[in-house]
């Protein structure tokens, strides 16, 4: 939107660019969730932050994000909020147009930006792709087989087939009917190893206790020093 379309909301400009883009046979990762996050920060401010699983974010990283990215959007005025909301709505239209023209899409949330937690932000991304008008089958393909094909590992990953690595999720409902069932799986098979619902909850609980600020700062400084001496 910012680049090729030069902030234009003109459908004709979008159509012409997608026609040109299609000649390249590209793969596109929309990252709708990160802009949605930006919109919510600018519009709802602290009320939105209070709804986020902030306990899962490393405290050092949280401080850095707050200073260098979040603060800007918390200070957004009404005019900026209106622009953000208009752009967010048009981003959905762009994704729908890309899909209609047969552009291969991937699921990627850009987790880690602006207090976006990994994991749940991927589900948010898929929800937004549905909101854009894509089918659940298209979104699931974008999260699985499309990604495997793009990375060149579709012979081993991306679908449930004989001979492929056993990576799959067991859900209470059919994701083709409702993607939200993926948010609380009954179990996961990772490289053939069964991870039960209880074990998944234990992993979630562990994620709520990241390393503390000073240990993280020490590790960061150690890494920077190591890089400087290379």
Describe every region a protein language model picked out.
Residues 1-132, 223-230:
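Active-site neighborhoods of metal-dependent hydrolases
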Residues 100, 127, 137-230:
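Active-site microenvironment of metallo-dependent hydrolases
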């Amino acid at each position: 939107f910012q680049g090729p379309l030069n902030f234009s909301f003109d459908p004709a400009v979008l159509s012409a660019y997608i026609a040109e883009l299609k000649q390249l046979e590209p793969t596109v990762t929309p990252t709708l969730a990160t802009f949605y996050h930006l919109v919510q920060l600018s519009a709802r401010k602290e009320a939105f932050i209070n709804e986020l699983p902030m306990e899962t974010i490393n405290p050092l990283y949280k401080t850095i994000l707050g200073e260098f990215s979040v603060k800007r959007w918390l200070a957004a005025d009404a005019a900026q909020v209106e622009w953000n909301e208009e752009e967010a709505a048009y981003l959905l239209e762009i994704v729908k147009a890309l899909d209609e023209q047969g552009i291969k899409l991937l699921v990627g949330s850009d987790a880690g930006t602006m207090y976006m937690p990994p994991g749940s932000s991927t589900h948010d991304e898929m929800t937004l792709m549905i909101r854009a008008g894509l089918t659940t089958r298209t979104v699931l393909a974008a999260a699985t087989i499309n990604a495997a094909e793009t990375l060149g590992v579709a012979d081993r990953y991306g679908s449930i087939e004989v001979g492929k690595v056993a990576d799959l999720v067991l859900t209470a409902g059919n994701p083709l009917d409702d993607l939200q069932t993926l948010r609380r799986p009954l179990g996961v098979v990772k490289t053939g190893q069964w991870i039960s619902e209880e074990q998944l909850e234990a992993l979630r609980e562990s994620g709520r206790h990241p390393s503390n600020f000073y240990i993280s700062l020490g590790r960061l400084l150690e890494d920077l020093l190591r890089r400087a001496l290379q």
